Amino acid sequence: MNIIKTDIEGVLIIEPRLFRDARGYFFESFSEREFEEKVAPILGHSVHFCQDNESMSSYGVMRGLHFQRPPYTQSKLVRCVKGRVLDVAVDIRKGSPTYGRHVAVELTEDNHRQFFIPKGFAHGFAVLSETAVFQYKCDNFYHPEADGGISILDETLGIDWKIPTEHANLSEKDTKHAMLKDFDSPFDINVNLYK
């Protein structure tokens, strides 16, 4: 496992170790032991995943930018098992020196990269291939009453989604999220969300 730190503390890119031969490849997509040994020390705390989700989407689908409000906050470990997506984490912690900044990473069926998004971040992705199968590991269960989001189309975030606007396909719910400037974040950099 290779861990790549990004420009925002706690947001990580994880590259699994692949074993290839004439038959194809094999890799461990997740090992709790290895995550605890290698990732937890970087984060400064443990993360215990309890729910796995999978979505299938077609080209131009954009999902996000989502989060769950306290006390049901979620960290996510995501990957693309089929196709290609641009995955994004946006820091929405009040008082954070990186508030409003984002990290974007391309996740594909070929690079096998995984992306760790901590609590206090909004998360979203755009499908860049004909179809994509996307998997999420979450460290808290889904609570619809705690659902939140900011607009995935907010140009002030400076995200290049690599999709022409006319091809963007959003759910009705995702078209109604507030822009960052109108958003009152439930997260604060001084509150430890992992206690």
Role assignments for model-derived ranges:
Residues 1-110, 131, 138-195:
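Non-catalytic, conserved peripheral segments adjacent to functional cores
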Residues 107-131:
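Conserved metal-binding segment of the jelly-roll/cupin
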